[in-house]
């Protein structure tokens, strides 16, 4: 994070054998780690980015199928709120995806950008696509998408 906090996505199985995504973090350069609450039940294979100082977005494989779940925390996972795009904006066939945040100072548009890649379909692992969001993940417009491969694949 911009304040030096180390953060990475996690998943754990609860007592009913349902997977849950969340985050772990360290404020002491990795000497100790803490974890608070899950972001959403029945989710795995998450990606985490800091969208603005102190605000983390967790983008998760949702085992219910059809689309990605997305949640926001401003307190390192103590509380989570569902992002407006959750289960709406990013279709997928229930598989791993990638998400990165590119700061305005590091790109030619001079805007913060989220880059996301996954199979852009609800069936099969094909149509591997990179998408860009210029509004914090609210929209992923077709003109900001690049299909890399139409064929079947095992991963991204």
Model feature map: region roles:
Residues 1-156:
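Asp-box/BNR beta-propeller blade signature and adjacent active/binding-site loops
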């Amino acid at each position: 994070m911009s304040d030096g906090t180390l953060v990475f996505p996690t998943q754990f199985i609860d007592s009913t054998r349902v997977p849950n995504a969340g985050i772990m973090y360290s404020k002491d350069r990795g000497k100790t780690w803490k974890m608070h609450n899950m972001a959403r039940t029945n989710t795995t294979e998450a990606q985490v980015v800091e969208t603005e100082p102190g605000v983390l977005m967790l983008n998760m494989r949702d085992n219910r199928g059809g689309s990605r779940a997305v949640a926001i925390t401003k307190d390192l996972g103590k509380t989570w709120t569902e992002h407006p795009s959750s289960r709406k904006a990013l279709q997928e066939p229930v598989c791993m995806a990638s998400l990165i945040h590119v700061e305005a100072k590091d790109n030619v548009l001079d805007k913060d950008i989220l880059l996301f890649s996954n199979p852009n379909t609800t069936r099969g692992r094909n149509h591997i696509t990179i998408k860009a969001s210029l509004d914090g993940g609210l929209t992923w417009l077709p003109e900001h998408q690049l299909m890399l491969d139409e064929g079947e694949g095992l991963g991204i």
